[in-house]
């Protein structure tokens, strides 16, 4: 493999994959470095809008990927007694971007589609198990030193430019001495993803439960997938919150344990933050490496 590329991208998630597709379409040589060996199989991101679908059309995956999506019908905000505070239906018409205004998706489906599409570009190369150790940002090129997580072999590649799409704990951001500025929002929420094994009369749109004791969100996702998110109370025990007993007690108004399986359970700290510098010389950051925002 050639060890010099137009652009090296660190991180093969949605941001890195989309950027690689745009650059490869422009006939640039791209090297993708990804720390993980395999695609992460569980739900994460679940929503995008018409502007994003327009980008997917640009990179040539819209027709393939739309079969893995559903149109998001909108959101209702209800109080703790179930009274509707706000009904926000999404328009059913195609927008000026030529797409519907809101979509639901399963992130692993998207990553499979975009990775398969990138295989058609001869100038695109990817390396898995690549744990980046050092980024050297010089006047004429960028040098990346990474270690294979299985063989422990050290590798060095160079490029004209480098973009770090390597998440909130970005080594790329640290390499350019960029720091996050906290914009004042920090909350812990549990995110519970489930797969229904029985037909249930659940809402066909997003519901925001505006309960001051425990705000929560319900998402109607693709296929049989459903998601509930709820805020943790101050000093609440995180391990206890993620036990099946606690989860099924929370879900009791909507589901019984024999009606679905828990696919994923995790606690996120939702933050609002922005990096004070997105570029230094030939090195850039993008996605969560550059900014963090709550999901709603």
Where are these regions (language model features)?
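Core beta-strand elements of the Rossmann-like FAD/NAD(P) dinucleotide-binding domain
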Residues: 3-5, 151-161
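Glycine-rich FAD pyrophosphate-binding loop
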Residues: 24-44
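Beta1/beta-strand and adjacent pyrophosphate-binding region of the FAD-binding site
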Residues: 1-15
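Active-site-adjacent segment of FAD-dependent monooxygenases/related oxidoreductases
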Residues: 44, 49-117, 219-221
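Conserved FAD-binding catalytic core of PHBH/FMO-like flavoproteins
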Residues: 116, 161-271, 275, 279
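Helical element adjacent to the flavin cofactor pocket in flavoenzyme catalytic cores
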Residues: 105-128, 132, 150
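Conserved mid-domain beta->alpha element of the FAD-binding
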Residues: 11-21, 33, 114, 164, ...
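A conserved short coil-to-beta-strand element within the FAD-binding core of flavoproteins
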Residues: 128-142
